[in-house]
Each structure stands twice: as structure tokens, then as C-alpha cells.
């Protein structure tokens, strides 16, 4: 059973303590009524992982844990088998005691694009919205963050996160909660809020931006990464039934339009930090994610278009400040 008690104890002593007015009841309701049918199987995989304290831990350049003495072939096989029980692995990669989890996404490439544009993360309390397996939270800790809190309702991601945490020596500097942002009160408590790969899944993107703003302290920083298309400040793509085979894509603005949206929501010092085409080297099928990936979602005769005929995925990173 995944226990959130450590997180409750941690925030009881800091500026997130007011969250305890609602959070334990939400988590209890989730544990009682909303667990996925495979959750027990996934949580068993976490439970059966060995307790290991890493001799060498690198979160600054990667997410890598090594032991002082190499593990036996049997120990490595046990870890690999249990981690494979948590497939598909989408966000990573992770290198854990000789088990290299080659995830669908090279999330380290995204981090390398984002990191140079951030305010110094040293000592910051961070919220990562739609955090997936938690890869970027570990990189935030590696960059000096005091605490990284991730929210993502996908329960497989929670178990992946807890598995990695266990293999990192039960590190308590990062925590993942199985919630969506609409379940959070206006905490106004985070120095930096990340929303990466979420906005285009929201039916009301401006409401999402307001929700992000409600989590920030005054002068806090928003890091927003999302799909964009080329165009001026009035350009927004509203896909039909699917975009790149995804049904739940609602609005894809230009970077300039997105800048206007942020301004409308009251953000200031808004800047477009990066715009990059998503490549089939960055998102692809691997041994740890064996179903369809980006190459299957692009027009085989024109990789500049999706199979539906829309512009192929391009992503922008925007940085903004809450005044």
C-alpha cells in the first residue's frame, strides 16, 4: 500500500500546512473508491522491489543510482522484471543499478531545453502539474529544489514514481499525489509551477492558466510547455476528432497567441523561451513502451504533417511571472 503519511508530516511543518484541511480526505476517498483495477498488481511490484540505498546518486545530469558493489545478475534481473511489470514507461530515462529504462520520451532532452531559462531552483518549493512518472521532479531536485510536489491522476504513473523513489533510497524530497489540478485548492504556496504537456488536453485552456496561477506565490514563476502551431497572435488550431491520433486535444495556439492568453490571465514578464519540433528520436517506441509512438502518428509521405493532415507536433516553452 502506498502511504502518503510522510508527505502529510512534511507539509504539517511548512507553508503548505493549510493543504491538510482538504488533502487527506481526498486521498482517503481515492483509496476507497477510485483505484484502478490493476492498482494492486502495480503496487505489489513496488512492494517487492529491494530496499537499496544508492552509493552514488546523480540527479543533476540524469536520474542515475549506483551501488558501491555491483549487484548480482539475479538482483538486477529481479529489479528489471518488477520494473517491466509497470510498463509502459513513457517519461524518463532512468538508470538504476544497471537497469536502464529507455522510456518512450527522452524527457532529459526537454529538461535540457527548459533548464537554462529558469530562475534558480535552489531552495524552491515546486509544483509539477501532470508530472507523469516524476522524471522531471527528480531533475528539479538535482537542480537544487527543496521540495517537488507532482500531481497526476494516472495511477500507473504513481506506482512508477514510487518504484523509482524506492530505488533512490526512499528519497523524500519529491512526492506524487494522484490528483488533477482541479482538485487542488488555491494554495498560493509554490515558488515555481510547471505545466508541461497538459494545456492542449484541457477543454478550457484559460481556466487551466488561472488554476496554475492560483498555486503560485506572488512573484512566483510559471513554466508552461505545450503544443503550438505557426502563426500570429490570433492563430489557434482546434483539431477535429483527433490530433496525432489523440482524441483529447482541444486547442493548439501559436506561441504568440499563448503569450496573449497568459497576459489575459494576469501574468507578466512573459517570454517565449524555446520552440522545437518534436522528433521521432525524442519520442519513439522502445522495449519499455512497445505500442505506437510518434512515427505512427505522422503522415508516412510527409513527416511535416500528422496522419490527419495537421501540422506535425511542435512544442513551445513559455516562462511567466505572477505579480
Curated annotation (Swiss-Prot):
CDD domains the UniProt entry points to: AdoMet_MTases
Keyword field contains RNA-binding: no
Catalytic activity: carboxy-S-adenosyl-L-methionine + 5-hydroxyuridine(34) in tRNA = 5-carboxymethoxyuridine(34) in tRNA + S-adenosyl-L-homocysteine + H(+)
Keywords: Transferase, tRNA processing
Domain of life: Bacteria
Annotated Gene Ontology cellular component terms: protein-containing complex
GO biological process, one term: tRNA wobble uridine modification
Cysteines engaged in disulfide bonds, as pairs: none
Annotated binding of carboxy-S-adenosyl-L-methionine, by residue: 91, 105, 110, 130, 152-154, 181-182, 196, 200, 315
Documented EC number(s): 2.5.1.-
Effect of residue 91 to A: Decreases affinity toward Cx-SAM and increases affinity toward SAM. Lack of carboxymethyltransferase activity, but can still produce mho5U
InterPro entries reported for this sequence: CmoB, Mo5U34_MeTrfas-like, SAM-dependent_MTases_sf
GO molecular function terms listed in the Swiss-Prot or TrEMBL record: identical protein binding; methyltransferase activity; transferase activity, transferring alkyl or aryl (other than methyl) groups
Family: Belongs to the class I-like SAM-binding methyltransferase superfamily. CmoB family.
Subunit structure and binding partners: Homotetramer.
Summary of the function given for this chain in its UniProt record: Catalyzes carboxymethyl transfer from carboxy-S-adenosyl-L-methionine (Cx-SAM) to 5-hydroxyuridine (ho5U) to form 5-carboxymethoxyuridine (cmo5U) at position 34 in tRNAs. Can also catalyze the SAM-dependent methylation of ho5U, with much lower efficiency.
Protein name: tRNA U34 carboxymethyltransferase
Organism this protein belongs to: Escherichia coli (strain K12)
